[in-house]
Amino acid sequence: MSACMSDPVHLSIDDGIALVTIDNPPVNVTSRAVREGLMAALEGAQAAGVGRVVLTGAGRTFVAGADAKEFSAPPQPPHLPDIVSRIETFPVPVVAAINGAALGGGLELALACAARIAALNATVGLPEVTLGVVPGAGGTQRLPRLIGLENALSLISEGKVIGAAEAEKIGLVDALADNPVEAARRYSWLERPATGALRGPVLNNAAIEAARKQVAKRSPNQIAPQKAIDLIEASCTLLLNDGLEQERAVFLELKSSDQAAALRHVFFAERAAMGQGKTGGADITSAVVVGGGTMGAGIAYALAGLGIDVALVETDETGAARARANIAKLYGEAVARGKSTPEKAEADQAARFRFHVGYDALPAADIAIEAVFEDIDVKRAVFTALDAALPETTILATNTSYLDVNRIAEVVRNPARFLGLHFFSPAHVMKLLEVIRADDTSPETLATALRLAGRMKKIPLLAGVCDGFIGNRILTRYRQTCDIMLIEGALPAQIDAALRGFGMAMGPYEVQDLSGLDIAYANRKRLGWKTKAGFRYIPIADRIVDETGRLGRKTNAGWYDYEGSKASPSALIDAIVIEESKRAGIERRAFSDEEIVARATTAMVEEGLRILEEGIAARSADIDLVMIYGYAFPRWRGGPMHWAGRVGLSEIERRIAEYAAKDPASWAVPNLLARAATEGKTPEDL
């Protein structure tokens, strides 16, 4: 007895055991068709009088949660909680054969089963809070009953995904097996209550309070993790059905919230970006990295971790020794984190790395990545040397943060194989990668770069050539807007506090102190901003560097004064700010936090719209990902462009027009915005 193989759920019966297989590629999400198929399969199994049901997934996934296509739509029957209840109350045991990832609704299905057998490489978790909701089919009520309060708090409120071995250790799965389906057919256990019939966990107020503090630190301003803790706490005292009713109400409330919409937007944007590296391009097996400093070493280490042989180039023996030390440090950190052993780390370094002084003896390589000082003449000299030393088929990539990629490409023989790869530091950790198309970059070169990004588990965002590309261009505009508010009446600590309140991880002046005031100072000198036509130059930051030598945390003084790691507002800096207002003939005025946030974020949006208008970015969602992953814009707000859509483009247009009336050198309504506001479009439509 079996269902049509084109159906997303198959039922087969052998020797009195029903095998129900969810087959909805690629990851067996619980779409409406799957839910209908599960109900039908259970009915068929019951009608056949089987003695056991084994529930599993086709391919390498059990069930990876809800169907993303249904996220924004009203729930359609049959609802997942009804299927979960049907499994839990089924007249014969249902055993979950967890053959791969069991996430979200997939784990909730497994929790309803009489037993859970997991493959050795299976993973389980309830990551719903990362999408702005809570589990909606019993996860917050059944999981604490099964594994205890503390374990459930950690898994659910943090959205953690754990491996099969850890799941068995905490009692989430009953056994591990090479073949979980066969093991589930034979598995025997003592009679025990269904998961939902177990007693609620013992209330532990200290554990709940600790979880709340941890969530507030890890996910500030986010609603879903705190709501999840509320529901887990309720599982200690409520009957199951009362807890399930409360959970479902919270789930449906959060599903329609702004935060859930923002996090869904980011989820889809990530999928679209990471999908770019899954087709086309060639595999990179060997690489040259020029520059063994923090950035270059991070890039080289990440490449070596993929099994790519790396030739690391420095200009002299001192630089080569520093590069070796930087690489050794990264491997040492991996050992300290338990990701490697001393023996393996030493063997990997010996197998993957060769260190070179100069370019004379470089091996042939599939790609060469430059990570040297941000000076166009230095970079052009590097690529002149690389072009002469390497085969004409080698892809050449610059890691510049701001510079004109087309000007650098002028020195190579075949500019079709040249592009920008803007990594973010530390390069082996940060997920963002801006992939810069030069005028002559070939589609094949782009495809290979995107394929490499996928192997590195980066989020690659395509960008055209302009100063700062997507992220640093918006950052520059954001900082300039904050500097203008300084000279008009705000102070650094107030601006930082207001933007942290909005959800930024750090304020702009805290960030500058962390990165070093000399970095932006050098960039302003390079661009000649003091005399740039049509640009409102604010000299405060340059005065701090020129007159005080304060460069930020590296000198224990910058925008703030420092005692160790503790920052405090600087009377000296505040005095310079106020003095600069007087020099400019500006009467200082009070700023509210709301005005600071509105101006700073609207500046990001205006610049983002110009980036779209000029074709530098292809999608507004790409801009959102750059700002979230590279510049700590709050994920739960969806990025600046998504945030603008929630505010409304008509309101953004009104604000910019108002700002432009007072400061036409800094503000103007982009043509793209004017059209979009008139036509009632959102940023996602542009």
Locations of the language-model features?
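Gly/Ser-rich catalytic serine loop of serine hydrolases
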Residues: 96, 100-106
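Glycine-rich loop at the start of a catalytic domain that most often binds anionic cofactors/ligands
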Residues: 63-71
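Conserved CoA-thioester-binding segment of acyl-CoA-metabolizing enzymes
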Residues: 1-56, 78, 82-85
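Acidic glycine-/aspartate-rich tracts in secreted/extracellular proteins
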Residues: 59-60
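N-terminal glycine-rich phosphate-binding loop for ADP-containing cofactors
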Residues: 23, 50-53, 74-79, 85, ...
